[in-house]
């Protein structure tokens, strides 16, 4: 073949290899993937009638993907070890070339379809598919020619061997995952029989509801193994806590638990954070720096927000997970790693794979054992024990006596908690800082709940619900609705108070000392523009919202005439002032995400830089926990 011709052929082959590797990483369905690989071979390189056979446990080759053959027809075709040309490839582990099939006595023509070739000659090239040195299948293609065998079979064999290697890796990955799944299912079945409720908090995890008890049983089951665990659940449901619990119950508990928030770092930083860098790798790299993979050696690496890493970085991570080794940025030495991986995400990874945003092969790698954390609204039994746990924790951290009224607990029980356990924890902490006598009462929750409920408010607004209909659930009046005789109770109902901005409460000295930082001033903030609707406001309370104010409001004074003096803020309908809308949403998002700007940005569909700018613009003090 002339030089130019060979050059263009190898370029085409390279392109096809690129296509094939993309196809293999793009779908969760192995058969479908293999059919597409064969289609690409036929389309790009005129390699027709492609066939992929895989070896079963009985050492029989079965056809799993074929060009131009129905699934039913393909399912019938099999070769035993040594049978026909295909069986020989399995037996010898060597490629085979048949220049003219019509003259080959070994050819069994089991798949048929070559009868209408007339004057053309069909040749066959077949190569073994190997995984970790073992033959797991056979890939064959036909070359059809008008002029007899063309004699390019050497390059065909080389090229098909590369394709077969890629297929081998994919098959191995699918089989490993399937095996681990089967193992876990057997284990789950066995352990379910022994499942007993877990009464006391384990590793600080409070759990009394049946679904959290099941989660903890799962934690017990997976902890002893090295299997990768994927923890899924909404923001604030306790994914990191569960990851730590798995580590603490594992044989690796005395080695480090290292966490990386993948969403918080741009790709270049993430790479050097995870893999480390060598001195001089980039401007500012003044000395060698160990990455988190190295720091977690012998222990557990927790990759939080794994769904947020870029496609480019997904490929890098996949390589490390497959090969268990990596190089530091700017370094050439290969470093071996021994970490147990736990990943977490609140994204729908299957959807991301479907949209091509998350690699299917990485998905398989990390989705070995999955633990789903239910949102707090689906495990209301946990609200009381969690609230008491946070009260006790605050009291202990600050060296003070603190209790919570039963009525306050009732209020908490009726909220929807879109920010989950983190929102509940923040709410209790804010209320605790306002308690002057060591008792958390319904009233002291009000300011906290303004913020908590703002998230619900935003959800309803984005759904286009009637703002008036929300008011009883959200407004401070709702929280201020307390029994007669109490400050702010029905006796004062006709003149409800606007919740005054509470004075900054100095943080108790103990807390600051415990954190090793100077004391901060906790400034509870009522939500700007959050005002109560007038009595009889339009729109029914939403039945999905169990917040306290679903009960009817006490009678209200009629709305003032336009000529009258402006009413107190609490008397005005619950419309969001135009200028305050972004501020409200910001507060909501920051509260919901535990004041992590990157997460809040994602929730709002903004960039982190935009959120940071908006926080400054609205003069919102950033809380640090
Ligand atoms: N079952 C629980 N018992 C006690 N505390 C809990 C529980 N679940 C969550 N928490 C507390 O709630 C807060 C949020 O939990 P965590 O950070 O683990 O959530 P997450 O799901 O990882 O959130 P994100 O997705 O936003 O990273 C933490 O302070 C954690 O200690």
Swiss-Prot record:
<dbReference type="GO" id="GO:2000144">
    <property type="term" value="P:positive regulation of DNA-templated transcription initiation"/>
</dbReference>
<dbReference type="GO" id="GO:0016887">
    <property type="term" value="F:ATP hydrolysis activity"/>
</dbReference>
<dbReference type="InterPro" id="IPR003593">
    <property type="entry name" value="AAA+_ATPase"/>
</dbReference>
<keyword id="KW-0902">Two-component regulatory system</keyword>
<dbReference type="GO" id="GO:0005524">
    <property type="term" value="F:ATP binding"/>
</dbReference>
<dbReference type="GO" id="GO:0003700">
    <property type="term" value="F:DNA-binding transcription factor activity"/>
</dbReference>
<feature type="region of interest" description="Inter-domain linker">
    <location>
        <begin position="434"/>
        <end position="582"/>
    </location>
</feature>
<dbReference type="InterPro" id="IPR010113">
    <property type="entry name" value="Nif-specific_regulatory_prot"/>
</dbReference>
<feature type="region of interest" description="Disordered">
    <location>
        <begin position="478"/>
        <end position="578"/>
    </location>
</feature>
<dbReference type="InterPro" id="IPR002197">
    <property type="entry name" value="HTH_Fis"/>
</dbReference>
<keyword id="KW-0479">Metal-binding</keyword>
<keyword id="KW-0067">ATP-binding</keyword>
<dbReference type="InterPro" id="IPR025944">
    <property type="entry name" value="Sigma_54_int_dom_CS"/>
</dbReference>
<feature type="binding site">
    <location>
        <begin position="296"/>
        <end position="305"/>
    </location>
    <ligand>
        <name>ATP</name>
    </ligand>
</feature>
<feature type="region of interest" description="C-terminal DNA-binding domain">
    <location>
        <begin position="583"/>
        <end position="625"/>
    </location>
</feature>
<dbReference type="GO" id="GO:0046872">
    <property type="term" value="F:metal ion binding"/>
</dbReference>
<dbReference type="GO" id="GO:0000160">
    <property type="term" value="P:phosphorelay signal transduction system"/>
</dbReference>
<dbReference type="InterPro" id="IPR027417">
    <property type="entry name" value="P-loop_NTPase"/>
</dbReference>
<feature type="compositionally biased region" description="Low complexity">
    <location>
        <begin position="489"/>
        <end position="498"/>
    </location>
</feature>
<feature type="binding site">
    <location>
        <position position="447"/>
    </location>
    <ligand>
        <name>a divalent metal cation</name>
    </ligand>
</feature>
<dbReference type="Pfam" id="PF01590">
    <property type="entry name" value="GAF"/>
</dbReference>
<keyword id="KW-0535">Nitrogen fixation</keyword>
<protein>
    <recommendedName>
        <fullName>Nif-specific regulatory protein</fullName>
    </recommendedName>
</protein>
<comment type="subunit">
    <text>Interacts with sigma-54.</text>
</comment>
<feature type="binding site">
    <location>
        <begin position="233"/>
        <end position="240"/>
    </location>
    <ligand>
        <name>ATP</name>
    </ligand>
</feature>
<dbReference type="InterPro" id="IPR025943">
    <property type="entry name" value="Sigma_54_int_dom_ATP-bd_2"/>
</dbReference>
<feature type="binding site">
    <location>
        <position position="452"/>
    </location>
    <ligand>
        <name>a divalent metal cation</name>
    </ligand>
</feature>
<feature type="domain" description="Sigma-54 factor interaction">
    <location>
        <begin position="205"/>
        <end position="433"/>
    </location>
</feature>
<feature type="DNA-binding region" description="H-T-H motif">
    <location>
        <begin position="597"/>
        <end position="616"/>
    </location>
</feature>
<dbReference type="Pfam" id="PF02954">
    <property type="entry name" value="HTH_8"/>
</dbReference>
<keyword id="KW-0805">Transcription regulation</keyword>
<keyword id="KW-0804">Transcription</keyword>
<keyword id="KW-0010">Activator</keyword>
<dbReference type="InterPro" id="IPR002078">
    <property type="entry name" value="Sigma_54_int"/>
</dbReference>
<dbReference type="Pfam" id="PF00158">
    <property type="entry name" value="Sigma54_activat"/>
</dbReference>
<dbReference type="GO" id="GO:0043565">
    <property type="term" value="F:sequence-specific DNA binding"/>
</dbReference>
<keyword id="KW-0238">DNA-binding</keyword>
<dbReference type="InterPro" id="IPR025662">
    <property type="entry name" value="Sigma_54_int_dom_ATP-bd_1"/>
</dbReference>
<feature type="domain" description="GAF">
    <location>
        <begin position="29"/>
        <end position="171"/>
    </location>
</feature>
<dbReference type="InterPro" id="IPR029016">
    <property type="entry name" value="GAF-like_dom_sf"/>
</dbReference>
<feature type="compositionally biased region" description="Pro residues">
    <location>
        <begin position="540"/>
        <end position="570"/>
    </location>
</feature>
<keyword id="KW-0547">Nucleotide-binding</keyword>
């Amino acid at each position: 073949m002339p030089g130019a011709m060979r050059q263009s052929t190898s370029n085409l082959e390279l392109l096809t290899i690129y296509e094939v590797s993309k196809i293999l990483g793009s779908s969760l369905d192995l058969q479908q993937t293999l059919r597409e690989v064969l289609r690409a071979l036929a389309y790009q390189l005129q390699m027709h009638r492609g066939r992929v056979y895989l070896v079963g446990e009985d050492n029989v080759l079965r056809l799993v993907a074929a060009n131009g053959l129905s699934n039913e027809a393909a399912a019938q075709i099999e070769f035993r070890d040594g049978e026909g040309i295909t069986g020989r490839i399995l037996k010898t582990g060597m490629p085979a070339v048949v220049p003219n099939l019509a003259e080959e006595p070994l050819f069994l023509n089991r798949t048929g379809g070559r009868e209408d070739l007339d004057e053309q000659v069909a040749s066959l090239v077949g190569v073994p598919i190997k995984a970790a040195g073992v033959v797991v299948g056979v890939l064959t293609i036909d070359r059809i020619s008008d002029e007899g065998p063309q004699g390019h079979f050497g390059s065909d064999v080389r090229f098909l061997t590369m394709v077969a290697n890629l297929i081998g890796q994919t098959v191995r990955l699918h089989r490993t995952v399937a095996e681990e799944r089967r193992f876990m299912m057997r284990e789950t079945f066995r352990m379910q029989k022994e499942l007993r409720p877990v009464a006391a908090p384990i590793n600080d995890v409070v759990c009394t509801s049946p679904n959290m008890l099941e989660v903890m049983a799962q934690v017990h089951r997976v902890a002893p193994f090295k299997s990768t665990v994927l923890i899924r659940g909404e923001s604030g449901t306790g994914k990191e806590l569960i990851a730590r619990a798995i580590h603490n119950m594992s044989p690796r508990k005395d080695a480090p638990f290292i966490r990386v928030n993948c969403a918080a770092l741009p790709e270049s930083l993430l790479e050097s954070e995870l893999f480390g860098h060598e001195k001089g790798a980039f401007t500012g790299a003044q000395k060698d720096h160990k990455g988190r993979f190295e720091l977690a050696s012998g222990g557990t690496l927790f990759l939080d927000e794994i769904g947020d890493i870029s496609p480019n970085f997904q490929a890098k991570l996949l390589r490390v997970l497959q090969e268990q080794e990596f190089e530091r940025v700017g370094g050439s030495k290969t470093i071996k790693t021994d970490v147990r991986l736990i990943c977490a995400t609140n994204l729908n990874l299957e959807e991301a794979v479907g949209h091509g945003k998350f690699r299917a092969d990485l998905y398989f790698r990390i989705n070995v054992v999955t633990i789903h954390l239910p949102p707090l609204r689906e495990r209301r039994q946990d609200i009381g024990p969690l609230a008491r746990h946070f009260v006790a924790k605050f009291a202990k951290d600050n060296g003070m006596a603190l209790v919570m009224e039963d009525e306050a607990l009732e209020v908490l029980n009726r909220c929807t908690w879109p920010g989950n356990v983190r929102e509940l924890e923040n709410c209790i902490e804010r209320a605790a800082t306002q308690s002057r006598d060591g008792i958390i009462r319904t009233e002291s929750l009000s300011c906290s709940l303004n913020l908590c409920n703002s998230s619900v408010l935003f959800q309803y607004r984005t759904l286009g619900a009637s703002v008036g209909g929300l008011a009883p659930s959200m407004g401070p009046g709702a929280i201020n609705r307390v029994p007669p005789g109490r400050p702010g109770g029905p006796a004062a109902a006709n003149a409800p108070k606007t919740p005054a901005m509470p004075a900054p409460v100095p943080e108790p000295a103990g807390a600051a000392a415990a954190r090793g930082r100077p004391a901060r001033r906790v400034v509870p903030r009522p939500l700007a523009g959050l005002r109560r609707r007038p009595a009889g406001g339009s729109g029914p309370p939403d039945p999905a919202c169990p917040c306290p104010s679903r009960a009817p409001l006490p009678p209200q004074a009629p709305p003032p005439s336009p000529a009258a003096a402006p009413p107190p803020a609490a008397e005005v309908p619950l419309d969001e002032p135009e200028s305050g809308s972004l501020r409200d949403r910001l507060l909501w998002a920051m509260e919901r995400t535990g004041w992590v700007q990157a997460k809040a940005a994602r929730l709002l569909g903004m960039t982190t830089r935009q959120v940071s700018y908006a926080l400054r613009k609205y003069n919102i003090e950033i809380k640090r926990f």
